[in-house]
């Protein structure tokens, strides 16, 4: 079994012309290929009696270098990453940026490993260490979240390269079928050399998983440029970060989706200001009482006689058949200069009367509703006030750059968009209760913060638009990818004794961290 796998691996490696020349220069003349010893055997080949490890469904042959030892990576991985050929059309990503991302992930994993190792060494000291252990657990959770997000972003940069199929090279196809097929398919089956060397790799660019991952990772260029331009250009080392103001506005109520209706296919109606701001739109013809909905008017009419109590009178009026063939009706904002006004060059019509009301109140009316909790934020639509009051007064979610968010999913969206940003921990959670325990707790936290080595370049932000990226609380929510086979599942770590959804991360003080190489002290 071992010799068979060894011969198959030698055959696969010798099939690459560029690898054959390098192997000839770096090995003895009598050696016919690269042999794997029992110590440096790649993880993709199992020893006798040992099951093969499960691989996450990573994309592309380039990802196979993540699972090879250093000596094999120097011979194989650099053929695809470090020396991109201008004649190779499949190399449409930057190898230097990829190496930088992998180095960042390596440092973060080493930091988490050091923290967990320190927790394991001090697990016997139960008395007086509960607050310190809880703070470390929060730090490990935040670091693992950052690692997973950065790993997904790194894998996403490789996805455009999959648009060019690799099946044109028989040797490369055979090597990828032997080493990377389980990683692409996400299976746990044994890796056996295929008898048919002409087997092709499935077109990942057409799969449902590929489309979902691309939709979740890629943000439009306009949104990225707008968010980058919102950074404070004057923010130096001594500048204080400006908290981001969270606007809980639902664009669907405002008719935010832009329609591409051809001209002449719809009729534009423009209501006056008085009609838009009128509290009632339906009135009783007998007593003159007004109502917001026609159903309330029908219920009111029952008090004016038995003829209004019949099923026909209480039923919702049926649509006139003649109106079905009528053109689509859209609405215009009466405010001159607004892009929703029909006189605007880039006119965007509003779909319904409700959209007209919400748009006009939000954009052109005074904000008369004030939050009773913070007494600072004002709204012109009562629904926006109620949405704001749901999270007002709670601890804000903070990023390492100092930007604050009212919701956790928006923080994670911000972290995924800007490289190097991570969720941060509050210093209040690190304080040790008790006067006798405080010196020991402070010293322990200083050691932990120093060993973690966090230091992010300070940056300010002004009204960065919220990236509404809905995420679940489960650590495997990021995409169809599953990281359990690679990381062993986040459940292997000791779960903190708090609810992540109710205890936000805050950030460590500036200047307490650095991504430099550590000395190895845990």
Swiss-Prot record:
Gene Ontology CC terms, in alphabetical order: nucleus
Q: Which positions carry the signal peptide feature in this UniProt record?
A: none
- Zinc finger (C2H2-type) positions are 282-304, 390-421
Q: Polar residues compositional bias: what residue ranges?
A: 1-12, 19-40
Annotated InterPro entries: STOP1/2, Znf_C2H2_sf, Znf_C2H2_type
Work out whether the entry's keyword set contains Methyltransferase.
no
Q: Where is the composition biased (Basic and acidic residues)?
A: 244-260
Tell me where in or outside the cell this protein is found.
Answer: Nucleus
Task: Spell out the residue ranges making up region: Disordered.
Answer: 1-43, 234-260
Q: What is its main location?
A: nucleus
BP terms from Gene Ontology: regulation of DNA-templated transcription; response to acidic pH; response to aluminum ion
Q: Does the keyword Protein transport apply?
A: no
Keyword annotations of the record: Metal-binding, Nucleus, Repeat, Transcription, Transcription regulation, Zinc, Zinc-finger
Molecular function as annotated in GO: zinc ion binding
- Functional summary from the UniProt entry: Probable transcription factor that may be involved in aluminum tolerance.
**What protein does this entry describe?**
Zinc finger protein STOP1 homolog
Tell me the organism. Oryza sativa subsp. japonica (Rice)
